[in-house]
């Protein structure tokens, strides 16, 4: 990975910093300790291209409902390439606790800044929206909230409770941050309102954490997944990584082994795509045959489900990923 650690190198000067404003692109990545050096972009192979269709009526209906209830989706904030398909099918991944993250991960397109106070009406608005959309399966995720004493776990729990009250048959997957320095408290809180699927992404190989996930720790994230599983052995745990950031195939396989060693049941692997020229460069486009190899190895390792492919994202077809896993969670194999 081409990274600049020389403070004397010729990088653009940082604009005036206003922590209350949401920073995206260069305004966000210019302040990380290890600078991203622009590289010539690799041409996209045919298999990586998304088939763009005309937005459906359902697409606009969901957007209107989200805006009316002051809700945010990670689909929009992270510039997910699958947004048209998912919205068109009536599914969305809800992002709670605002749209400003306290971290500056240079692979991610979610904005950075000083988060706003929690919206006390958000759990109710979220639950009403899910009920109005008649969703059978929902994914709730969030920005990192290092400013909160519980890392936002209490807000997650309240959202789960309200959704269950209004939509008792809806299955709930949560995609959580690492609750850095607050794991004990967060697990204590989530223990009172556990989800149907617990998801926390490792994102990449540990060798690349300093560049790709500043402020995060690989072993800490694995421990979060293992400790949750110990508290809820019948609740599936899930994690995902991106490929194309500079990892090797062996590193991908080792991350998968580490997941299984920490009792992770479900896996997602997808191709990293640059949100903009200010983000980490794509170092390789992984061939479909290699994705197939990852998938085959995943099932050999004992994963209950593996969603693996170029356009796979953590929440993409999450309902299909979880189908049959949640129902048979108590019979899942564990190493």
Curated annotation (Swiss-Prot):
Which InterPro entries does the annotation name?
Aldolase_TIM, Elp3/MiaA/NifB-like_rSAM, Lipoyl_synth, rSAM
What does the UniProt cofactor note say?
A: Binds 2 [4Fe-4S] clusters per subunit. One cluster is coordinated with 3 cysteines and an exchangeable S-adenosyl-L-methionine.
* GO CC annotation, single: cytoplasm
Major localisation: cytoplasm
Which keywords accompany this UniProt record?
Answer: 4Fe-4S, Cytoplasm, Iron, Iron-sulfur, Metal-binding, S-adenosyl-L-methionine, Transferase
The UniProt similarity line reads: Belongs to the radical SAM superfamily. Lipoyl synthase family.
Name of the protein this chain belongs to = Lipoyl synthase
Q: What is the lineage of its organism?
A: Bacteria, Pseudomonadati, Pseudomonadota, Betaproteobacteria, Burkholderiales
